[in-house]
Every structure is written in structure tokens, then in C-alpha cells.
Amino acid sequence: MKFVFCFSLLLACSAGISITSAQAADGQANVVCNFSHMKPDDAIMMPDMPGMAMSHDFMGNRSTDAFSTAETLLQRSGTTCNNGADSTGYWIPTMKLPDGEIVHPTYIKTYYQAYNVGQYPVTGYPHGLQLLAGDHRGNSPNPHISFLCANGNGYTNKANQICGLRSKGDAVQFNIGIMFPDCWDGKNLKARGTKNAVYSDNEGQCPADHPVKLPKVNMNVAYVLPQITSLDVSKVELSLDPQLVDGELTPLWGSIYTAHGDFMNGWTEDATRFMADHCMNFAMECSTNIPYSFTEAVADTYVSNQTEADTNFGHATTLLVQDDWRNSGRNINKQILTLIKFKIPPQPTNIEDYTGVSFKYKIRLYEGNITDAKAFTIFFYPTTPDGWDENTVTWNNKPSFKYSSDASLYMNNTQQFRYVDVDSAVRAALAAGKTEVAYYIGGERNGRTISVNSRESGKTPTMMLVGYQKVVEP
């Protein structure tokens, strides 16, 4: 059985079409997951009771069943989601069309969102967190459940639409939006019987008895139905808990107003921490750039030649880059190089579970041209991570390097986070038995100055291991 939650805020986003909302998110990330499997299981409401729950459609973790726990989701972490860091179990009741056909979601697109983070910052999801949304006994509109016809006028709480063919003319697309609560009580990880989470108010503030604000899970379930040309939403049915009669289970069905969703957190701990501390709380649109694992720079500084050749800049909050190869060349002109070191983030120990997922190493920096409005390329030159300290290194005692780059980054004068692919170089370092890598960042060779935020600034340079696989959104 499901517990009934009554809440007050609706913010709905579409999967596969434009987003509509009552309030724009400050920070946001998203994940797209294909349908995985159907089972009459529910690990939140009927744990360890296989076959006893209503029929559910599962997305995300491929192994989710009645016995799933936070531990098993990470141990058997194969996922249908495009972000390899997300092995969450997402599930919803199975749908039946008016003609009796059972259909499954084509995909879900889930937005992770935060509001008013300057005043009310979010915390990463705790390991083992479960969330519920909606009412499986519902018979009227719910403020946290919404419906959309792709050929219509956006999301509505009322089931009074008749969906026609979407703009492509190839199928009826019907979406269900499910908004999960975002204020946790800080104690109860399990949702069954605890009311462990409620919704923040319109300002993004959580109540005193549920003080821990989390990124809001805004799940959008898309059914792409090429076999029909019209759908009366009021006649759609969803599975209910079966009835036990004479020792046999009889399936039951309810109206579309019984729509609800279950969430069992399967993000890696690094991913949830990054989502909160390095994305949402910076009011960023991070899209799919939520890493499986990451490390923050363990050392960063810059070195400068000529009159500053013996000066150390280890405590600088802003690092500088300047490179001028004109006229007499770089050794005569002013030159400033940023020096940065990372521990290499760990890869999955169960990599065989991640069929289809491509993992790549990236560096994320907050930087920009501070000389003029020009756009240009900067370069990442490998150097040794050993034998230098950010608090003592200067131009005159800096580690050696060659002007042969492992990576480059095209950038302009906008100060923002940027990502650079260093996958090949980091994998070569791993193959050589290294656990750390270090880089000089060199300029565009025409004398312009670039600023890079250091680890002392709050916008810490990070090295990320990002896993991605293509998910079809027809």
C-alpha cells in the first residue's frame, strides 16, 4: 500500500518537449533513462515480498526488484540511464490504454532542481534515501502529479485532455509529471510509514521538522505511442495493489489520478555531493555533467618569470595565465603559467556492469579571458606531480615540462565553469601506475591574461570521471 501525501507546489517539466514551470530553477541537472523491466514488486512498500505488489514499470537500475536495497543498487549498478553515475531505482505503476493494451514508458527525463539556493542551499542525497510522490488511491487532481499531451498546451493536473498526434505526426505522446518532496527529516531513510520527506514552500524553505533541503526530483514519464492516433486521458488506467481471493492474486486497476512514483537513491556518493556542492549551490545548469567520481585539486598556484621569478603565489584565490610568443619569443616576454595537481578519481570496481557506458576523465575550471572580448585556445602541458609544493614553488624552482599539450580548451571572456577532456592522458598515467597527475596551463601565445579560480576561491578546480551512454528519446 502507498501512503498519501498532501503537498502544495507544482513545477512540471516535459520530457522530450519544451519545459514549462511555475518557477525557474536556480540549479539543475538531468538524466534520461529508458524503460528497463516490469515486475509486481515494490522494494519500498513491500520489501522482500516478490510478486505481491501492483505491477510496476522500472527505469534506471536494471536489477531493481522486491529485494533491492541501497547496497544492491550500487553493487549491481547496470543502468538504463544516460549518466553512468545514476543507478537509482525509479518505478511507477503500469499503464493500460482504453482499449486494454498494456504499455510501458518509452523513457523518463528526470530534472534535479534547486530553488533560492543563496538563502536555502541543498544537501546531497544520503545513501539509502527513499522518496514517494503521489497517491495510489487518488480520485481527483493532485498538485504534484501532472499530465501532458505533446500536441496540447502544457502540463495540467486534470485528466480532461484528449491527446492527438504530436507535431512530428508519427505518434501520440502522453507524459506524466511526478514531483517528489525535497525536505528530508534528517533521520528516516525509509519512506514506508515515516513521512520522511515533505515539500519546500514557494520560497524554497523547508519546515523545521524536515530541515534538510535536497535537490528536487522532477520525474517526467514519456509514453510515445505510434499505434494510436488519439488518447482520452480520462480513460487511461494504472495498476493497483492486487486483491487476494481464494489464495490467488487478482490484478486491479485505477484511474489516471492514482499516478505515483517511487525513488530509491542509487547515485554514487561522489555524484550526489557534486550535484549539491558543485552544481546546485552554484545555481548552475549542469545538464549531464554529474560525475561518477571526482577529486578536488590537491595543489594549485601560478609561477611568473622576470621580476616575479622568485615569488610564490600558493595562497592566491585567482590564478593567472599569460603567454606571449610574439616578436622575440616566449623566453623574452612576460610569461605566467598556472600549475595544478589532482589525485585521479577512482573508476567503478564493477565496470562489467556498465554495459554501453563510456567513462571519460575531464577537468573542470572556472576561468575566462580578462584582457578583452577575444575567444582563443589555451593549453594543458603535463608535468610531474612530484617534488613541488604550492606554497614554495616559484618560476625559478618549478618542475620541468615541454610545450607539448595533452589537451586544449577554446574559451572567451565569460567567467564560467568549463570542461576539458584529459581522458587519454589520465589513462596513460594510470597504465604507468600513477595515482596523481599535474598540468601547467599555458596561454594563447599572444599576451592576453586568463584568470582561473583556485581551490582557495570556493570554486575549486576538479577532476571528474563522467560516464555517459546514449539513450533514445524518440
Which residues does each predicted region cover?
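C-terminal segment of classical bacterial N-terminal signal peptides
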Residues: 12-21
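Ser/Thr/Pro-rich, low-complexity mucin-like regions
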Residues: 428-456, 470
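A short beta-strand element within beta-rich, extracytoplasmic domains
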Residues: 340-342, 352-370, 464
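Flexible, small-residue-rich N-terminal segments that precede or flank a structured functional core
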Residues: 289-348, 444-446, 455-471
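Extracellular/lumenal carbohydrate-interaction signature centered on repeated Trp-anchored short motifs
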Residues: 332-334, 346-359, 429-430
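Positively charged n-region of N-terminal signal peptides that target proteins for export
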Residues: 1-4
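Beta-strand-rich interaction/scaffold domains
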Residues: 367-430, 434-435
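Primary mode marks residue(s) on the alpha4-beta5-alpha5 output face of response regulator receiver
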Residues: 25-53, 57-178, 186-290
